[in-house]
């Protein structure tokens, strides 16, 4: 390689875009990852297809995998300017399917969490390559966005991890703030979940 070729190599790498893997990928096959600069730990998001609609907003479950455990969510879309939220549920692969972990009016669990601080931490954003934010959650068969953000979920995992899982041993689960980047596209989607 010549010196000029070595100089141009980083520019060519930037021109390819920030997403690793195929240029196109269906939402249910996408894998998203985020790392922290001071650790080798990886936080992952997968979008798992539901046998039926996971919620009125999407036919996908969101699975957040931290170095400590898995958390499962369904999507909710508010009218107006409120945007997209994720609501915690139990593992949809478990016998009997998922159960809401939130109380009324956001979930059907009579003993579920109703703390507004937790609810405010459950925002969900998808961003395209130009960093435009989508107004609807991902759906099966649609193009997977290159980026996902859960901007305040780290706060909920730190202070209220037990509210986001049915794991009774759940305690503080540290997670950095950042953006999940699409890093792979599975050959086949996750098996369908839910009842």
For the regions a protein language model found, what residue spans apply to each?
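Bacterial N-terminal signal peptides that target proteins for export
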Residues: 1-4
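N-terminal secretory signal peptides
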Residues: 16-109
